[in-house]
């Protein structure tokens, strides 16, 4: 019985971990071999688990808004961010990995205030 139970339990644990591993596989959604730099105005920022999301209207204003995923709220706080570090209307520069599917989605690796 023990020889049969161990592989079943092991398989169950592996299957339970798979969604978490897939969720955190950055390279499946974003092209980590290249980065983009965009300047624009913060439209909104959502501090929600599992990730902070920043919505940006690019300076050219002809393009649709961009959405940038960041780390978890806890990770952003550990990196020195506060809930009011960036506010609606702030002009920022975002460096990000673009979405593989060509959508206006990216994973932000750096966000900083811009002087225009």
Where are these regions (language model features)?
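Bacterial N-terminal signal peptides that target proteins for export
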Residues: 1-9
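Short boundary/loop segments of OB/S1/cold-shock single-stranded nucleic-acid-binding domains
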Residues: 20-36
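Conserved hydrophobic positions within beta-strands
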Residues: 40-42
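Short aromatic-glycine-enriched beta-strand elements
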Residues: 48-58
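A short macromolecule-binding patch
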Residues: 61-72
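Short nucleic-acid-contacting surface segments enriched for D/E, G, S/T with interspersed K/R
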Residues: 77-94
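OB-fold/S1-family single-stranded nucleic acid-binding modules
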Residues: 99-116
């Amino acid at each position: 019985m023990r020889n049969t139970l161990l592989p079943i339990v092991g398989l169950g644990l592996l299957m339970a971990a798979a969604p978490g591993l897939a969720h955190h596989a950055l390279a499946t959604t974003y092209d980590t071999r290249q980065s983009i730099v965009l300047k624009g105005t913060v439209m909104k920022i959502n501090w929600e688990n599992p990730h902070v999301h920043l919505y940006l209207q690019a300076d050219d204003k002809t393009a649709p808004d961009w959405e940038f995923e960041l780390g978890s709220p806890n990770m952003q706080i550990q990196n020195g961010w506060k809930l009011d570090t960036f506010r609606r209307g702030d002009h920022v520069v975002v460096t990000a990995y673009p979405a593989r599917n060509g959508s206006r989605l990216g994973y932000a690796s750096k966000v900083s205030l811009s002087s225009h």
